[in-house]
Amino acid sequence: MKTIMLVDDSATILLSISNILAKAGYATEKAANAEEALRKLGTGLKLDLLITDLNMPGMNGIDLIKEVRKLAAYKFVPILFLTTESQQSRKLEAKAAGASGWIVKPATAHEVLNTIKLVVR
């Protein structure tokens, strides 16, 4: 079973996306912010994909990606953004930081799962 970490400051989004993923057969690990995600990753969690919000209180998603990419165990783990932003400049910034893709909220279950299938093999 593939494990996906979800990072979002919205409990509603975390619940909604984790339900979609569970129904599709994925295990999920949830974090309410970037700092919590980094703490969990520090425990050596086996991870196949990280999905993060871009705009969160404290450390934002771009800074989270930069920190994750410094961790040897997660250097090549795919990372997707799930965010309300759709500006091309932000997408380029995310790609430069190491993001593998982008999902614009609100997204349907179909959009989420198809995007995941493109980056998780």
Model-predicted segments: where are they?
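Receiver (REC) domain active-site loop signature in two-component systems and cognate sites
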Residues: 56
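His-Asp phosphorelay/catalytic-motif detector in bacterial-type signaling
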Residues: 46-48, 73-78
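Acidic, metal-coordinating helix/loop segments flanking the phosphotransfer/catalytic sites
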Residues: 30-49
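Charged docking surfaces used in two-component/phosphorelay signaling
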Residues: 15-23
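A Lys-centered signature of the CheY-like receiver
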Residues: 105
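Alpha4 helix (beta4-alpha4-beta5 surface) of REC/receiver domains from two-component response regulators
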Residues: 63, 86-101, 110-114
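Acidic catalytic/metal-coordinating carboxylates
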Residues: 32-36, 60-66
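Active-site residues of response regulator receiver
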Residues: 53, 83
